[in-house]
């Protein structure tokens, strides 16, 4: 099952089985430093502060961003194994894959995964947990 399919299933569960389409899924890096975080973004200023540029239409969509790092060697990437959701919680299982060749020295950066989700599935107070495959916590947030 592809990552996009898993995201669509999670969003459908959040929406109470209504038909929902995830518009975009993006991965990349940002030089805005910090630790591991899961964030909900509701406007362009939030994205700009994170150094992320994406075509989010905030009148009808919101973004959820998983940030991991920082790293000082090139080549790290995020792997999202699964996303499960119910009416109270979303659980994301993810980790970062180190570069096979050890990477090259680089300025510090963080990796990110951005999900763009329709506003109609937004539910204030939903808990979003990100854990490793061994169930160690990475980050938690609540939809504000």
Residue ranges and their predicted role:
Residues 17-144:
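Exposed, flexible binding/inhibitory loops of compact, secreted disulfide-stabilized domains
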Residues 1-7:
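Bacterial N-terminal signal peptides that target proteins for export
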């Amino acid at each position: 099952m592809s990552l996009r399919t898993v995201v669509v299933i999670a969003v459908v569960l959040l929406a109470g089985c209504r038909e929902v389409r995830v518009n975009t899924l993006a991965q990349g890096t940002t030089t805005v430093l910090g630790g591991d975080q899961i964030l909900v973004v509701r406007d362009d200023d939030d994205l700009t502060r994170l150094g992320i540029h994406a075509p989010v239409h905030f009148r009808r969509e919101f973004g959820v961003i998983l940030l991991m790092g920082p790293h000082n060697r090139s080549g790290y990437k995020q792997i999202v194994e699964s996303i499960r959701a119910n009416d109270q919680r979303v659980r994301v299982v993810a980790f970062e894959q180190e570069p096979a060749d050890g990477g090259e020295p680089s300025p510090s950066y963080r990796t990110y995964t951005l999900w763009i989700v329709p506003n109609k599935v937004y539910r204030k107070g939903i808990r979003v947990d990100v854990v490793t495959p061994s169930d160690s916590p990475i980050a938690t947030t609540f939809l504000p």
